[in-house]
Amino acid sequence: MALSNMDVKGTSSVTDPDGTEKKSVTFNTTPPMSVYLLAFAVGDFVHVENNNDFRLPIKVYSTSDKAISQGQYAADLTAKCLSFLEEKFGIALPVPKMDGLALADKQGAMENLGLVTYAEASMLYDPHLTPLSRKAALSSTIVSLEAQRWAKDH
C-alpha cells in the first residue's frame, strides 16, 4: 500500500527491466504547501477509520494490527479536533482526506498535510492496557499538531 498527502488518483502495473511486475501509484496534486510537509510511505499497512460525521475520512494506519484495536481513539479525536478548528477559524482543510501513520521506529510526530506521522506511542491507545496519562499525552499531541495547521502552516 502507498500513502501520501493526497488521495490516490490511479494505479497501474509496470514491469521492471528484469521482468518483475510492480504497482505504480499516482496521487492527486497537493494544494500549494511548504515542501517540508510532503510525506509518503509504502508498506503493509492496516487501518481504522473515524466513527463520526466529519466531512473528510480520517484513517489511522499502522504496520501492525495495533491500528485496528488501538487506533480508533486517535481517528475519532482527530475528526473532532478538525471539525472544531474548521468551524472556529472558518477555513476548511484543502485536502480530501486526513491520514495518521503510526510508526514503530519514529520519535515524536510531524503534521504533514494529509498524512501525519506519529510514533506508535503517540497515536495508539488501548483503553484496557494504556495508562490514562498516556491517553492525555496522546490527546495533547494530536490537538497541538492539528492546531498548528491554522496557527503555523497557513
Language-model features, listed with the residues they occupy:
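Hydrophobic helix-coil surface modules that form long, contiguous segments used
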Residues: 1-140
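Catalytic Zn2+-binding segment of zinc metalloproteases
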Residues: 146-154
